[in-house]
Structure formats: C-alpha cells, structure tokens
Swiss-Prot record:
<dbReference type="InterPro" id="IPR008271">
    <property type="entry name" value="Ser/Thr_kinase_AS"/>
</dbReference>
<comment type="similarity">
    <text>Belongs to the protein kinase superfamily. CMGC Ser/Thr protein kinase family. CDC2/CDKX subfamily.</text>
</comment>
<feature type="binding site">
    <location>
        <begin position="10"/>
        <end position="18"/>
    </location>
    <ligand>
        <name>ATP</name>
    </ligand>
</feature>
<feature type="compositionally biased region" description="Low complexity">
    <location>
        <begin position="656"/>
        <end position="680"/>
    </location>
</feature>
<dbReference type="Pfam" id="PF00069">
    <property type="entry name" value="Pkinase"/>
</dbReference>
<keyword id="KW-0808">Transferase</keyword>
<feature type="compositionally biased region" description="Pro residues">
    <location>
        <begin position="643"/>
        <end position="655"/>
    </location>
</feature>
<keyword id="KW-0547">Nucleotide-binding</keyword>
<feature type="compositionally biased region" description="Low complexity">
    <location>
        <begin position="410"/>
        <end position="444"/>
    </location>
</feature>
<feature type="compositionally biased region" description="Low complexity">
    <location>
        <begin position="483"/>
        <end position="494"/>
    </location>
</feature>
<dbReference type="GO" id="GO:0004693">
    <property type="term" value="F:cyclin-dependent protein serine/threonine kinase activity"/>
</dbReference>
<keyword id="KW-0723">Serine/threonine-protein kinase</keyword>
<feature type="compositionally biased region" description="Low complexity">
    <location>
        <begin position="597"/>
        <end position="616"/>
    </location>
</feature>
<feature type="region of interest" description="Disordered">
    <location>
        <begin position="483"/>
        <end position="507"/>
    </location>
</feature>
<keyword id="KW-0067">ATP-binding</keyword>
<dbReference type="GO" id="GO:0106310">
    <property type="term" value="F:protein serine kinase activity"/>
</dbReference>
<dbReference type="GO" id="GO:1901987">
    <property type="term" value="P:regulation of cell cycle phase transition"/>
</dbReference>
Length: 680
C-alpha cells in the first residue's frame, strides 16, 4: 500500500470495497479492491487464481498485482481502472441505447463469457454492475469472487446460492447443485432483455417471487418439457405443499357441506345452492391436478428450499401459464418462449433476430440452452442494418403488435381444432378394429415368450461358457503350479551345485594358502642356513688368513706345492662352474613347473570346475636352495700366499655342516721355540 495513493472510494460490496488510486512511481490510475472475506481454492485466493488464468484477454479486466495487509486478514487486488459500467449507463434516464450499441455490448459480453468457458471457468455473478465499459466502448468482465472451475458436465455438488437474484436461472432457484456454464447464459439473456426494454426482466423480491415471475412468463415446467425437473428439491417442496393445501381445503369443504345437509333439511333450495358452490370450488381446485407429483430424493448436500407454496400468486398454475403440459420438441419450446415474450413485450415483433437469440438463452431446460460459441454465430451479429436504430416504444407499434398477436392466436386455435379432429378420427378407427388389437396383443405376447426363451438360451450358453472358462482356468492354474514347482526344484539344485563348487574352490584356496605358507617357511629356513654358511665361510677365511700368516712367518712354501695348490684351485673352479650350470638348469625346470601349476590352478566356471591338488615341489625347491648356497659361497684365492710344505691346505666342502681348521703339529712345534726365544 505504500506505493499507492488512495484518491476516492468507487463502490462497496458484500465482500469488500473498491477505491480509486494512483501509483506513486508510474503515476497511472488503478483500482484497489479490498477483500475481507477471502475465499480460497487450491491454496490460492479464488479471484486471483482465475484472473491470472484469464490474463491479457480482451474482455476480461486485467489484474496487475495483489498483496495482503493487516496480518494477512485483508487481500488487496490492484487492477486497471475503468470508471464506467453498464448499470450506470442503463440507470441514467437521459441515456438511450441504440440497437447497434445493444448489439455491440451483447457481442462483447458473449466474447468475455466465451473466454471464461473455454478456460473451464464459470463466472456465476454476471450482472450489469460487473460489466465495466471503457471510454473507448470496450466491455470487460470483473468480480470473479464467486467463480469456480468445472469439468464437462461435472458431477460434483456446487452451491446453488450464487448469481444475483434478478439474473439467477430457474435451476438454481429450485436448489440444483449440479450445473454447468449454462447458468451464465441465462444471466446474459436477462441482461439483453433489460437493455431492450430498459427495465428488469424478472425483479422478484425473493426467490419465491422470482420463480413466480419466471413461471408466469414461460409456464410451469414438467418432466415432458424439462426432463429431470421433478428431482430438484425446490420443485418437490413447491408443488407438494400446494397439493396438500388444496386437499385440506377440499376436505374442509366436504365436511362443511355434510353439516349443512344434516342441519338444514327444510331449506332444500339453500342446500342446493351450497352444493353448487362447493362443486364450483372443487372444479377450481382441480387446476393443480396437471402438476407432476413424481419426485426423487434430493442430494443430502443440497438444502431444501421451502416456503414457495404459500407466497406464489393465485393464478400461478392457471391454464394461461401451463403451456408445457404436452410433449414438445426443442423448436416448439422456442416458439412458445417467443410467444410468451411477445405477449409481454409486443415491440419484439419488429426485432425477430433479438427475439430468437433471447428465447434461446432464456430456455427453462438448461440442457436446451444455447452456449456462448453458438450465440456468437447467431445471424443477428452478422447483419449491420440496425446499427443506429432506436428500440421502438410508441403506441402505434403496440397496436400493430396486438394485431399480430391476435392473428397468431387464431392460427393456433385452428391448429388445435384440427388436432382434435385427428384425435377423434383415430379413436373411431380404434373402435372399428377390435380384432386387430387382439391380434396385436397376441403377437406381443408371442414376442415376449420368444424373448424369454431366447434369454433362457442365452443364460444356458453363458453358464456353459463360464463352466468351460472355469475348467480352463483350473488347468492353467495347475500347469502354473507345476511349472513353479519345477522351477523351484531346478533353482534348489542349481544353488546346491553352486554351493558345492564354491566350497571346493574355498578348500582349494585354503590349500594353496597353506602351501604358500610352507614355502615361505622353507624359504626362511634356507635363508637362515645361508646366513649360517656365510658365517662359517667368514670364520673359515679368518682361519685361513691366520694360517697363511703363520706360514709366511715361519715357512717358505716350495714351488711344487704352489703348483699343486693352483691345480687344485682350478679343479675346484671347474667343479663350481659345473654346479652352477646344473643349478641354472634346475631353476629353469622349476619355473616351467610353477607356470604349469599356475595354469592348472586358475579359477574355472562353477559348472566345469574340477579340483586337482597341486603337485608339491618341495624336493626341487630344497635342491634349488642348496644350489643357491653354493652359488653364493666365496672362493678363496691363494695365488700370492705361501703354502705349508708337508700338509695340503684344507678345502671348503659344499655341505651344510660347518668346517673347522686344523694346524699341523710341525707348525705348533716351530711356534713354541720362537716364543720361548722371544721370551728369553
């Protein structure tokens, strides 16, 4: 509200008020509508919902914005400002609408109604005050507070307390809760007649008076003229109460006549007069016998409408208004409606197109009522001769109209007389041909018997078919059960086989893991042995070094001994080379065997998996480790070291046992004197 300045108040309604305002930034005029009773549908205000659906249409008012004030208790709608409306124009005594203006406004009104109905929306409150007219003569529909959506002949219950009373159709006045967009077309017809006559078409003080005016003009509806009217709650309540009142009056008059006959035996003339008067009263009371008494129970959601019978006019059911007691087609009903309108408004004789369109929109039966698309295609909107013609209201015109009405009534009387003659001829023919009726009855009975026989045969056939279908269904069920059992058995066997293969595979993996652990243990043992051998070799080299030192100090080896030692060393080297070659060959063989084992131990599919324990190659591995020890043994080189003369040097053996060095006794004897000499 801070962006708008309120200039003046335009109007006040049941659910809020409308103000004229101006936008502070754009300086454009707007209409601000304050709504206190906010009706919502699908979590959104009704008027906002449907105005957004009908946005930017030519004959619908444009909604610019909306917001809440006073703690969301008041809804404010910002719409385009249009100062004039149709009610202000018609209520001005100095303003007289031409026939061209009436046609223009009616066409624009039908365009707006069509835009609503095409989008699945019923306005439910069409009246002149809700038809805004711009300075350019554009008519726009406004006030969608009572609008609702509908499906094609929706079966949901709706409120019957909608549409302003003067423009409310008869089905809503009779309490119907199932209706469609045809209720808007009745309102358009009332507005058209109001513009033509410059006065309200039906201006009842309440719902009862409104029904009275409608039925006075168009006659009392029956099941023949309006199928389904007797099921409306207001219809039953209306006519049943009237019949009860007439029966009570008849009973009272009969009792009164009996008392007069018993008490006034001497006054025969008076009694005869009283009886004649009572008979006349009874004849007058019989005018309600033409009203249909059949009724259906009304829906529980629609409240009954009461109080019609007590306030309807006395000539409500007179013969003058009972024009629908016979069976008529849609064209006959339109002709009767046109006649009734001409009787009340004689100047419509000179406006046949207007009369035709109005009678099609003001049909009592809503299913026979014209829709907005059909109304826009009416010939009245295609002609342009009456654009500037003023609606006639002169006395000469009324005389001409009365003459036309008298001539039409004479024609109707002649037609009625002709129909009576035809009925009499038909009755005579029926009396002359009693035998034909009997034959027809017999044929009818035979046809009924044949139909019964055919029904029995059809029933027997259906029973046989059902029995056959049951047997077929049972067989199919049995086959399905067998298939299911077979599938279960196959699945169980497959699962068992798969489990067995899985267990075998797990066992094989466990065995492989155990073998790998054993191999690791063997490798660790071999490593330990290799370490021990290396230690022994180191000790051996230390002893040899000590021994050579002793030899260098106390002896000079001979050349022959040196040559022998060299030969021995060469032989040892040759032996070591041969051993290395053998070890390489054994390693190659072991690698080939390991590759073969890996190929054999690869995982195969469960269906063709055959477990074969691997071949243990413990001996070959042991040999391989033993050869590996020989490869890593260091070879002593004694080319430039002195050798002892009497004894050969001890050589390292390729066994796993540790070697020990022995010193010859000659060396010990030589060492001792030297020590003693040095001591001395």
């Amino acid at each position: 509200m801070e962006d708008y300045i309120i200039l003046s108040k335009c109007g006040q309604g049941t659910y809020g008020s409308v103000f004229k305002g101006i936008h502070k930034i754009t300086h454009s005029l707007v209409a601000l509508k304050r709504v206190t009773d906010i009706a919502q549908e699908d979590g959104e205000p009704v008027e906002v919902k449907y105005l957004n659906q009908l946005k930017n249409l030519s004959n619908i008012v444009n909604l610019r914005d909306h917001f809440y004030i006073d703690k969301n208790s008041v809804l404010v709608l910002i719409m385009e400002f249009i100062e004039g409306d149709l009610w202000k124009i018609m209520s001005n005594p100095q303003c007289t609408l031409s026939l061209g203006q009436i046609k223009n406004f009616t066409k624009q009104l039908l365009e707006g109604v069509k835009q609503c109905h095409v989008n699945g929306i019923m306005h439910r409150d069409i009246k002149p005050a809700n038809l805004l007219i711009t300075t350019n003569g554009v008519l726009k529909l406004t006030d969608f507070g009572l609008s609702t959506s509908y499906s094609k002949r929706s079966e949901k219950f709706l409120s019957s307390n909608v549409v302003s009373l003067y423009y409310r159709p008869p089905e809503l006045l009779l309490g119907s809760c199932i209706y469609g967009p045809e209720i808007d077309m009745w309102s358009v017809g009332c507005i058209l007649m109001e513009m033509i006559n410059n006065s309200y078409l039906f201006a009842g003080a309440d719902e009862t008076a409104q029904l009275d005016l409608i039925f006075k003009l168009f006659g009392c509806p029956t099941e023949k003229s309006w199928p389904g009217v007797s099921s409306l709650p207001g219809y039953n309540d209306l006519f049943n109460k009237q019949q009860q009142q007439q029966q009570n009056e008849n009973n009272y008059s009969k009792q009164h006549n009996n008392n007069n006959n018993n008490n006034n035996n001497n006054n025969n003339n008076n009694n005869n007069n009283n009886n004649n008067n009572n008979n006349n009263n009874n004849n007058n009371n019989n005018k309600y016998n033409n009203i249909s008494t059949s009724c259906l129970q009304s829906p529980s959601s629609s409240p009954p409408i009461g109080g019609y019978a007590s306030s309807l006019s006395s000539d409500f059911n007179s013969n003058e208004y009972n024009g629908y007691n016979q069976t008529f087609s849609n064209e006959d009903c339109l002709a009767i409606s046109q006649k009734k309108l001409i009787d009340k408004f004689p100047h419509l004789v000179l406006l046949p197109s207007v009369l035709d369109l109005a009678s099609k929109m003001l049909t009592l039966d809503p299913k026979k009522r014209i829709n907005s698309l059909e109304a826009l295609e009416h010939p009245w909107f295609k002609s342009s001769n009456d654009m500037d013609q003023i609606v006639p209201f002169s006395k000469d015109f009324t005389d001409l109209a009365n003459r036309y009405i008298a001539s039409t009534r004479q024609l109707q009387q002649q037609q009625h007389h002709h129909q009576q003659q035809q009925q009499q001829q038909q009755q005579q023919q029926q009396q002359q041909q009693p035998h034909q009726q009997q034959l027809i009855q017999r044929q009818h009975q035979e046809q009924q018997q044949q139909q019964l026989i055919q029904r029995q045969q059809e029933q027997s056939k259906q029973q046989l078919i059902q029995h056959h279908q049951q047997s077929v269904n049972q067989q199919q069920l049995a086959q399905q059960q067998q298939l299911a059992q077979h599938q279960q058995y196959n699945s169980q066997q497959h699962q068992q086989h798969h489990q067995q293969q899985h267990q075998q595979h797990q066992q094989h993996q466990q065995q492989q893991q155990q073998q790998q652990q054993q191999q690791q243990q063997q490798q660790q043992q071999q490593q330990q042995q290799q370490q021990q051998q290396q230690q022994q070799q180191q000790q051996y080299h230390q002893h040899q070094q000590q021994y050579h030192q002793y030899q260098q100090q106390y002896h000079q080896p001979s050349q022959q001994q040196q040559q022998q030692q060299q030969q021995q060393q060469q032989q040892q080297q040759q032996q070591q080379q041969q051993q290395q070659q053998q070890q390489q060959q054994q390693q190659q063989q072991q690698q080939q065997q390991q590759q073969q084992q890996q190929q054999q131990h690869q995982y195969q599919p469960p269906q063709q998996y055959n477990h074969q324990p691997p071949q243990h190659q413990h001996q070959h591995q042991h040999q391989h480790q033993h050869q590996h020890q020989h490869q890593h043994q260091p070879q002593p080189q004694h080319q430039h070291q002195p050798q002892p003369q009497p004894q050969p040097t001890p050589t390292p053996t390729p066994t796993s046992t540790p070697t020990t060095t022995t010193i010859p006794p000659t060396i010990t004897t030589t060492i001792q004197p030297t020590i003693s000499k040095s001591n001395g």
